[in-house]
Amino acid sequence: MQLAGCLALVVAVLAVIVHSWRFDHKPRIYGDRLPRRVLLPSQRQVQRKIIVYHNFFRTRVDPKASDMLALTWHREAARSAQAWANRCKLLAHDSISGRWIDDFGSCGQNIFISTHRVPWFFAIKTWFLERHNFTYGSRGNSLMKVGHYTQLVWAATHKVGCGFSECGGHKKYFSYVCNYCPIGNHLERLGQPYSRGKPCSGCAKDCNRRRLCTNSCWAADLWANCQELYRTWPNWLCRSQHTSQGRQRRDNCKATCTCAGKIK
């Protein structure tokens, strides 16, 4: 009798579960169930979501970052990302000139492709999950294995613009492209894409409610050794604009010359 009672109870519970399950509530994630319009970065709402997702993951690094800048949308970066997404080159990256943005130079680029339409959150999270291949502070990190992650969480990057395209041909797929300015993934610092420490401890009072820094620089250095040059010859580098060579030096080291106290 006890066994019969237990079986009856199990059957009753299963009946309740089956009855209460709504088959019309399947996740609207894959295929045509996800409308194309909710993926188009030309839409302001989509732009806001992309920014929120990026900044969410930038606060989830381990170890914590003391100097992680908040990302904001950049129209020109989005335009170049969309142009490249439209080319449908699978996972190949755009050229240096194709990613060039005034004041920032060539920007970084992450690409995600899928055989189905998936939310931007899924694409960005896929890049972030490369953190499992990453060791902070190590010289042994491989750009091929962690490059999407390190660009996503590169502290000095503070502008992003993205593009989305449906690619035809024999096998249809969807291309998600984001360009990041200023560019990250400098090989000599690949193991330290940000400074380790308490969130916002590296930006004093320039911190938002998400504990991300806001003291970004409006431009980027185009020469790799601008800061070294400034330490030795500051006037020669930044204050000799009376000659064409002086103006050229300053133009190539805008961040060093004009953004004291900023994260760059």
Language-model regions: role of each:
Residues 2-264:
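Mature extracellular or exoplasmic CAP/SCP-family domains and secreted bioactive peptides
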